[in-house]
């Protein structure tokens, strides 16, 4: 309920309560007393509504804060895992594919050491912004910790994931070049045509592919369709 609706309801309640009090009295009250009593009841109801509305807003803010990375303003790991569980269950019901991707900034520590933490933070913000811009509103982008990001892509099959990985790499390269940063990225993505047994299995698979891309020499991507075709490597 909105604050405006709550105030209207509280006014109606105050008038109803006041009318009930007046009807219950054997003798009528003087007009100033009537006005004062009505004003007091209205004030009490309005104050209660405003207080409850403020508490509700604060609770919603705290809940959102607990699910958001404070630097990049994308979801944090906790929110990402919760969303992955929801989408995995939906994929089981609908039979639609689900894709998850992990992205790691190669040698991010060097950026922090050479340019400072402020530039490192700015780089992470730029990465998060690029990932949001390359994905749909129904998809989820999260900072999983440090310089590692995750993407949860609903109803996304193999060909669509292939295209997304290409778009991500191009967008990230452009964002880094614009700021003059020398940074590459390792990406691991997996599309589950058949839903995995658990969220942990889904996350672990993407993480393993990401590290496989790093072992291939970094600045690349590994993509796999579970049960479909062998892992692909994009240098």
Regions found by a protein language model. Give the residues of each.
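Short regulatory alpha-helical coupling segments
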Residues: 63-64, 77-97, 128-136, 154
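Alpha-helical scaffold within the catalytic cores of cyclic-nucleotide enzymes
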Residues: 128-129, 160-178, 205-207
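A short pre-motif secondary-structure segment
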Residues: 140-143
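Juxtamembrane or sensor-core-proximal signal-transducing alpha helices
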Residues: 42-66
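Conserved nucleotide-binding and Mg2+-coordinating catalytic segments in signaling enzymes
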Residues: 63-82, 103-117, 125
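Short helix/loop segment flanking the catalytic signature motif in cyclic-nucleotide metabolism enzymes
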Residues: 123, 150-168, 202
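Catalytic-core segments of nucleotide cyclases and related cyclic-nucleotide turnover enzymes
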Residues: 162-166, 192-235
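Hydrophobic transmembrane alpha-helices
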Residues: 1-33
């Amino acid at each position: 309920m909105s604050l405006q609706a709550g105030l209207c309801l509280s006014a109606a309640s105050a008038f109803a309560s006041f009318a009930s009090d007046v009807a219950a009295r054997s003798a009528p009250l003087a007009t100033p007393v009537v006005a004062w009593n009505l004003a007091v009841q209205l004030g009490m109801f309005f104050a209660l509504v405003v207080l409850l509305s403020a508490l509700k807003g604060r609770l919603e803010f705290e809940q959102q804060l607990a699910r958001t990375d404070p630097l990049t303003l994308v979801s944090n790991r906790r929110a990402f895992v919760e969303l992955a569980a929801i989408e995995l269950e939906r994929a089981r019901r609908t039979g639609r594919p689900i894709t998850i991707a992990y992205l790691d900034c190669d040698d991010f520590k060097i950026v922090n050491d050479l340019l400072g933490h402020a530039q490192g933070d700015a780089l992470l913000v730029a990465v998060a912004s690029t990932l949001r811009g390359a994905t749909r509103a129904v998809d989820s982008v999260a900072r999983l910790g440090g310089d590692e990001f995750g993407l949860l892509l609903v109803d996304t099959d193999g060909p669509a994931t292939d295209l997304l990985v290409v778009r991500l790499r191009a967008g990230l390269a452009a964002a880094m070049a614009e700021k003059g940063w020398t940074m590459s990225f390792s990406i691991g993505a997996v599309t589950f045509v058949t839903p995995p047994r658990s969220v942990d299995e889904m996350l672990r698979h993407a993480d393993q592919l990401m590290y496989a891309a790093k072992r291939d020499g970094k600045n690349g991507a590994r993509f796999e369709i579970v049960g479909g075709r062998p892992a692909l490597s994009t240098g």
